[in-house]
Amino acid sequence: FDRKIELQAPTASDAEEIITHYLKTKRVSDSVNMEDLTRMMRYNSCAELETILNEAAVRAAFARKTGIDMEDMVSVVLKQQYGAQEDMPRVSDEVIEKGALHEAGHLVVCEALCPGSVGFASLLPSDENRCGGFIHCCKGVSDSQSAIIALGGKAAVETRYVGQVAEGCSDDIACAVNCIREAAAKEGTLGFSLLNVESDSSSNMSESLNARSEAAVQAELERYYGKARALLAQNEAFLKEITEALVMKKT
């Protein structure tokens, strides 16, 4: 019992084979698209995939369906992996529209930087007239790209509602800042003077170096925000289309 065995999460191709294996014993509708299914799911373990498929089977049986369809799979993935509520909370149209615009901003910037990278996106309405959401990126992106993507939601809302500061973006901004610091530490994106000193595991820095690094990070944050706005302007029709689709679905 003194040995440690490292187990890696399934890859996309692994996940598709695992899902196919578990679905062999279940009745499945032709509407289930295996490629779309593997793109929308996060797969940390085989057990997690099996649980999702079993929950989808239970949902289909409860609705007295002849087999599992894509709607069952999407509903279970939303609930199990992204915390969606079973019953849709009542949220105002304005909140839904801003939430949809925010998530569409992330999605459009992500697709502009890395085509085909978004596997799933949805709104997550919640109590107290709030609406969050997410995009699931199924391809690897660099720290610099992640920073621009994180700022896409804020950029989209502030481009549409000129003069307003987008609400609920603190986590996105924190994510962007951390990505900028990681890129500076690992890739030297802010010059060699900040290389290997700006990650979460950094040792204590001198006061002058800390001031210099913070100034560089803030400047990079502004530059990436400008890039996000530029990408959204170049893809205005796509942004409108995605926003409308999210508003229509609401979840």
Segments (PLM) and residue ranges:
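Soluble catalytic regions of large protease machineries
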Residues: 95-100, 107-251
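Conserved C-terminal helix/linker of AAA+ ATPases
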Residues: 60-84, 117-125, 191-201
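Residue-level signature of catalytic and energy-coupling elements of molecular machines
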Residues: 1, 15, 45, 56, ...
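Conserved C-terminal "switch" segment of AAA+ ATPases
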Residues: 7-72, 153-158, 186-196
